[in-house]
Curated annotation (Swiss-Prot):
The gene coding this protein: metE
Keywords: Amino-acid biosynthesis, Metal-binding, Methionine biosynthesis, Methyltransferase, Repeat, Transferase, Zinc
Pathway assignment: Amino-acid biosynthesis; L-methionine biosynthesis via de novo pathway; L-methionine from L-homocysteine (MetE route): step 1/1
Annotated positions binding Zn(2+): 641, 643, 665, 726
PANTHER family assigned to the protein according to its UniProt record, in alphabetical order: 5-METHYLTETRAHYDROPTEROYLTRIGLUTAMATE--HOMOCYSTEINE METHYLTRANSFERASE (PTHR30519)
Protein name: 5-methyltetrahydropteroyltriglutamate--homocysteine methyltransferase
Amino acid sequence: MTILNHTLGFPRVGLRRELKKAQESYWAGNSTREELLAVGRELRARHWDQQKQAGIDLLPVGDFAWYDHVLTTSLLLGNVPARHQNKDGSVDIDTLFRIGRGRAPTGEPAAAAEMTKWFNTNYHYMVPEFVKGQQFKLTWTQLLEEVDEALALGHKVKPVLLGPVTYLWLGKVKGEQFDRLSLLNDILPVYQQVLAELAKRGIEWVQIDEPALVLELPQAWLDAYKPAYDALQGQVKLLLTTYFEGVTPNLDTITALPVQGLHVDLVHGKDDVAELHKRLPSDWLLSAGLINGRNVWRADLTEKYAQIKDIVGKRDLWVASSCSLLHSPIDLSVETRLDAEVKSWFAFALQKCHELALLRDVLNSGDTAALAEWSAPIQARRHSTRVHNPAVEKRLAAITAQDSQRTNVYEVRAEAQRARFKLPAWPTTTIGSFPQTTEIRTLRLDFKKGNLDANNYRTGIAEHIKQAIVEQERLGLDVLVHGEAERNDMVEYFGEHLDGFVFTQNGWVQSYGSRCVKPPIVIGDVSRPAPITVEWAKYAQSLTDKPVKGMLTGPVTILCWSFPREDVSRETIAKQIALALRDEVADLEAAGIGIIQIDEPALREGLPLRRSDWDAYLQWGVEAFRINAAVAKDDTQIHTHMCYCEFNDIMDSIAALDADVITIETSRSDMELLESFEEFDYPNEIGPGVYDIHSPNVPSVEWIEALLKKAAKRIPAERLWVNPDCGLKTRGWPETRAALANMVQAAQNLRRG
């Protein structure tokens, strides 16, 4: 029984973000479709070769996506919303981009599909839309073409396919309501057709991803798995693949399925290997997800070996990444600025492939000498002074309940804030960032590279802040922002100014479509050596009589959007960050900033996948926010912002944040999210987003007015704010001006009644 290794997927974007650049060039009309497709082919070939050279036995094919892999699956199944369909029913790459970006075939605006987080990661997918009586057919053969590509290059491949039950689970019904699970029998023939095509190509194993199996699914959904997989059996061997949590609670359902193997995440799940071995059919292959695909830390291979060694030789066994390596940066070797000590603690996607090769070799040979050598830096890290700060640990231990309480309740604070700011009805504001123009990016890059001195850099940033204030005053906005010209990323910027973080040069991971992020890495205890945002907030406020918001990223979001330490709890990291940012709130307030926004877009996405684990997470997540904010005086207005959230199941916790104003993303869901706030009778103020910033479309005054009137039927108008869905960093100035002008006009029309 020779043990093989494999990955569940590999980063798509390229070491230098080649995919992003090719996509954006194509969207801008600066390159042809064939040039775009050629970049995809080159990246796939390179990534397969890199994995093979690193010692991977079975290469994933079908993990590449032009926007996201769920949208790819929608096209595979012929599931294209009517507003994006070509007249002749054909599907091409432009169809895919229209769904993601919001366009009709005519080029006219057409609402993009809703976007949400992929389970509890920082990756996004376009939510499949289902209508009653929907038809499915194989229309997009990208997977088959890529398998042909890989086979032509001589690779041993394992196609990757999102499973039918998870696909339906991830979608939403549009129009007349019905049970989307009833579509299962309609999509299975397409899956059968795809598997038959793969069998024709001589494929032995197909990785069929069913991550929904780690959730606490309703019984009807669990019951759907058996008939679904009965229909799919027989053409190729199926590796039923789960990740992000353990499978033990649903193991009875899983072991009844006619598949030939099971992949389990042994990093994030609590599954016991011996128990799995005992309960799985003896002829099943077990794929052990031992190497963390979601973090950047070097694996303790001695520990991983001990976890799996007792079942070696007792059943067919593969070793694998816990999930797709999509969530990890590509290659540590190109990071030239990390010092040797810190660098020795990390492993990116390619290094994780090396770890899998090393682990496979040791499991096959029984010679464990190489494991101790690989794991040595991990032992050293446990005692490093760069990891432990006694002052931070002491301050954290001294926190009391009083530290998370504002002085007075919202009603008292609201009165003080109304007296201070005297804002009109339907007050208008934006979420924080303004367009990051080429000039701004060049300015920051030149400064970072040392081509620009600090004085000239500061002069340049000040000019862009001044321009943002002038633009907002010209538009007639009521509460202004400084525009965040100095910030490359809402998390990275804070991480750069906090002790306990390090940064990479090329540690990019895909967020959605062409958007990539470069998450900071928490390597040690977190503290704030000096004020971070005060200088620029104070400068912006000096340029106007209108209030300017101080802008902070909240502790839970900084945690969720960073690569966290693995040696302490997430709660500990969040509260350390909260204490650091608490000092920032106090300093902003002392500098005369009266409105401070603490963004927590990641609060909901940080939820554990199993509802039974939610309460503990929400308790410390809310406490971290309150520790951050509670230092503010009554007449300081605390705002928070949240993105793409389903709120109804966490409304108690949203209210418990006790923010004076919450702004939320609602335009893509047509204000549906406000139902949660209405039913809960949310007591504080709300800014429902009135247009989608992820699309270049400019909303009309009438459209915005209609949304606000809809909102006012649910929330009293005196508690409503008017704002876009999210920050405007990724938009251009022309559409930003046009959209905000219409937004302000809509608010003014409503004030006039």
